[in-house]
Curated annotation (Swiss-Prot):
GO biological process, one term: regulation of cell shape
Reported function: Provides the (R)-glutamate required for cell wall biosynthesis.
Protein name: Glutamate racemase
Isomerase among keywords: yes
Phylogenetic lineage: Bacteria, Bacillati, Bacillota, Clostridia, Eubacteriales
Catalytic reaction annotation: L-glutamate = D-glutamate
Length: 258
C-alpha cells in the first residue's frame, strides 16, 4: 500500500477522541481513519500515571499493527501522562497529542475567569502546570476537575436531569458574569456542550482543542509528504476494547456515520 493511503490512527480512553477525529474528517475527508477507543479501561483520569502510560503504549502498539501512518493521542489524560515517552520510543511516525486550548481562550480577551474543565490527572500533570506557568500570571484561570463526566458520556448520557444537576453542582461557585471562557480540557466533553449551555449563559464561549489538533495533524502529514492525494471519501474503522456492539453503535452515533 502507498504510504499516503495508509490510515491515520486515533486513540482515546473511550469515545471522547471521536470529537477530535470528527474535526480531522471535516478537514481531510479523503483520509482513511482507524479509531481505537479503550472504553473497557475508561475513565483514565482517575488512574495512576503508570497505569495510563501502560494503556497508552498498548493502544499505540495496536494501532501500529494496523499499519497507520500517524497517530493522534486524542485523550488529554494520556497526552499529559505519556506523550513524551511515546514520541521517544516511536520516532519514525508523527504522533500528535492534545492539550487544553488555553492559548485560544486567552485570545477571547473577555472579563472573568477562564474555567478549565478536565480530569483530575490532566490537572495534576506537569504539562498542565507548564500551561499555568505560561498563562496563569496574566489571566484568572480556574481548574475544575470533573471526574464523573467521562462516565456519563461513556454511557451515552449526553443530556438529561442527572447530567444537568452534576454540571450545576460543578459551576455552583461561579456566577455567569464571573466566567469569561470555558475550556473543555477532555475530548469527551464537547459531546455535552449543549447541556452545558443549559447551565451557563449562551454568550459564554465554550472551546476545545479538537480543531487545533487536527490542523497540527495536517501540518505534520504535509511536512512528511504523507497527505492522501485520493479525491474520494476515505474509510472510517472503529474499534473498541469493550467489545460490545453497543459501544460501536454509540461511537457511530457520536461521529454521525452509518
Amino acid at each position: 500500500m502507498d504510504k499516503k493511503n495508509r490510515p491515520i490512527g486515533f486513540f482515546d480512553s473511550g469515545v471522547g477522541g471521536l470529537s477530535v477525529m470528527k474535526e480531522a474528517i471535516r478537514l481531510m475527508p479523503n483520509e482513511n481513519y482507524i479509531y481505537f477507543g479503550d472504553s473497557k479501561n475508561a475513565p483514565y483520569g482517575v488512574k495512576t500515571v503508570e497505569e495510563v502510560r501502560t494503556l497508552t503504549f498498548n493502544a499505540v502498539e495496536s494501532l501500529l499493527e494496523k499499519n497507520v501512518k500517524a497517530i493522534v493521542v486524542a485523550c488529554n489524560t494520556a497526552t499529559s501522562a505519556a506523550i513524551d515517552l511515546v514520541r521517544s520510543k516511536y520516532e519514525n511516525i508523527p504522533i500528535i497529542g492534545i492539550e487544553p486550548a488555553l492559548k485560544l481562550a486567552t485570545k477571547y480577551n473577555r472579563k472573568g475567569n477562564i474555567i478549565i474543565m478536565a480530569t483530575p490527572m490532566t490537572l495534576k500533570e506537569n504539562k498542565f502546570k507548564s500551561l499555568m506557568e505560561k498563562y496563569g500570571e496574566n489571566y484568572d484561570i480556574v481548574s475544575l476537575p470533573c471526574a464523573k463526566l467521562v462516565e456519563f458520556i461513556e454511557h451515552g448520557i449526553l443530556s438529561g436531569e442527572e447530567l444537568e444537576e452534576y454540571l450545576k453542582e460543578k459551576f455552583k461557585p461561579y456566577k455567569n458574569n464571573d466566567i469569561g471562557v470555558v475550556v473543555l480540557g477532555c475530548t469527551h466533553y464537547p459531546f455535552i456542550k449543549e447541556t452545558l449551555y443549559k447551565v451557563i449563559d449562551k454568550d459564554i464561549p465554550i472551546i476545545d482543542g479538537g480543531l487545533g489538533t487536527s490542523q497540527e495533524l495536517r501540518r505534520r502529514l504535509e511536512e512528511k509528504n504523507l497527505l492522501n492525494t485520493e479525491e474520494k471519501q476515505g474509510s472510517i474503522t472503529i474499534i473498541n476494547s469493550n467489545g460490545s456492539e453497543k459501544m460501536i453503535e454509540l461511537s457511530k452515533k457520536l461521529i454521525e456515520i452509518s
